[in-house]
A protein has these predicted regions:
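Conserved functional hotspot residues at active sites or interaction interfaces
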Residues: 1-145, 149-172, 196-346
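Extracellular/cell-surface secretome signature
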Residues: 171-197
Length: 346
C-alpha cells in the first residue's frame, strides 16, 4: 500500500506507438482510492538524449471533445503526433487534422491508415485500451488545432518526437529566403532547418485537457531563468471570436476562431484573460536560445536544458496541495509556485 502523501515509482516495459498506428498498446493504472499519477518518458533520461513527462488525468475527468496542441515537425524523421486512448469498447473517434499525416497501419484490421491533408476528417473504431497514434508527414507540419470528437470519453496526448523552441528555421515562401536572416535562399522549411534552427530539439508530450475543462483566466510564470532565453507560449481557442489579452501586454494577439492558435515569446510573468475558453501551453526554450543556431552557444544563451511542454491550469482549478516527483539524475531541479499575496507555502 501507498501511504497518504507518499510517492512510488513503477517502471513499465516499453510499448511504443511509433508512426501512425492503431493497436492495443495502453497501460491501465487502477487504485482503490484517488491518486495522482504522472508518466515520464523516460524517467531518468537513461540511454536517450531527450525526454518529457505528463500529468495523467483520471478517467472520470476525460472528455469527448479536444483540440490538439503540440509543436511543429522540424526534422525528416522526428515527427509531431496526437495520441488517442480508448477507455471503453466500441469507441468511435473522429479526427479533423490540421496537418499532412503519415501513412500507417490499423493492427486490429490489417488495413492501411491513409495519408490525410489539412482539413481532412476520418473516423476510427477503437476498443478498450486501443491506442490511435497519428504523426505528421513533412517538415513544418503542426498538429495543433486538430479536432478530436468521440462518442465515449477518451484520453488524448499531444507531443513531438523532437521539436524546437523557439523555431528559427522557417522559409519565407514569398521572398524565398530563410526568415532568420532574410538572405539564405530557400524553397521550403527544410532548406532552413539543419543550420538555422535553435539547438537543440527535445521530446515533448502532454496529456491534453478536454475542452470542457478549459478556462478564461490564467497566470503565466517564467520558468527558472537560465540566462536571457524566453519561454514560448501557445494559446488555442475553443470557440469563434475569442479575444485574448495579457497583463502586462506581451504581444499583439489576433481574434481567434475555433481551433486557431497563436504563439509568442516572453521572459516575464503575466496574466492571460480571454472572452471564451482557451488552452494555454508553455514551452521551455532550447539551450542555444535566444540566438539562432549559427555557431553554437552565444553569450546570453540558456546554456543548459532543452524544450519541455507544460499546460497551464486555469485559475479556478488551482489546488491547495500537490505531490510531485523530481527525478534524481539531473543537474538542476526546481519548482515554480504561483500563489496570491500573503499565502503561506510549505
Amino acid at each position: 500500500p501507498i501511504l497518504p502523501g507518499e510517492l512510488r515509482v513503477y517502471n513499465l516495459p516499453r510499448r511504443d506507438a511509433d508512426g501512425t498506428v492503431l493497436a492495443p498498446l495502453a497501460y491501465r493504472v487502477q487504485s482503490s482510492i484517488p491518486i495522482t499519477a504522472y508518466q515520464f518518458n523516460p524517467l531518468d533520461n537513461e540511454d536517450v538524449f531527450s525526454n518529457d513527462a505528463s500529468l495523467l488525468i483520471p478517467s472520470n475527468v476525460l472528455g469527448k471533445y479536444y483540440f490538439v496542441m503540440t509543436r511543429e515537425q522540424t526534422f525528416d524523421d522526428l515527427r509531431s503526433f496526437v495520441t488517442v486512448v480508448a477507455v471503453r469498447d466500441d469507441t468511435t473517434v473522429n479526427v479533423d487534422v490540421s496537418a499532412p499525416t503519415l501513412v500507417g497501419t490499423n493492427v486490429r484490421t490489417g488495413e492501411t491508415i491513409e495519408h490525410m491533408e489539412p482539413g481532412d476528417s476520418r473516423s476510427f473504431h477503437l476498443m478498450e485500451y486501443d491506442v490511435l497514434n497519428i504523426e505528421t508527414d513533412e517538415i513544418g507540419s503542426d498538429m495543433s488545432g486538430t479536432m478530436i470528437l468521440a462518442n465515449r470519453n477518451v484520453a488524448v496526448f499531444g507531443g513531438s518526437e523532437a521539436s524546437n523552441a523557439p523555431n528559427t528555421n522557417h522559409c519565407d515562401k514569398q521572398l524565398k529566403v530563410c526568415e532568420w536572416d532574410g538572405e539564405t535562399p530557400c524553397e521550403s522549411n527544410s532548406d532552413c532547418t539543419s543550420k538555422f534552427n535553435t539547438c537543440c530539439a527535445d521530446h515533448l508530450e502532454q496529456q491534453l485537457f478536454p475542452v470542457k475543462t478549459w478556462g478564461q483566466h490564467y497566470l503565466a510564470s517564467k520558468a527558472f531563468p537560465r540566462n536571457l532565453e524566453k519561454d514560448v507560449y501557445r494559446i488555442i481557442a475553443a470557440e469563434n471570436n475569442t479575444v485574448v489579452t495579457t497583463l502586462p501586454p506581451q504581444a499583439s494577439i489576433p481574434v481567434l476562431n475555433q481551433g486557431e492558435w497563436v504563439d509568442f515569446e516572453s521572459i516575464e510573468n503575466f496574466e492571460i484573460h480571454a472572452t471564451r475558453p482557451i488552452m494555454v501551453g508553455q514551452f521551455l526554450a532550447a539551450q542555444d536560445a535566444p540566438g539562432p543556431n549559427i555557431d553554437g552557444a552565444q553569450e546570453g544563451d540558456a546554456g543548459i536544458g532543452d524544450p519541455a511542454f507544460i499546460l497551464l491550469v486555469p485559475n479556478e482549478q488551482f489546488r491547495s496541495d500537490y505531490v510531485f516527483l523530481a527525478p534524481n539524475r539531473y543537474e538542476l531541479d526546481y519548482v515554480t509556485v504561483v500563489v496570491p499575496d500573503g499565502t503561506k507555502v510549505w
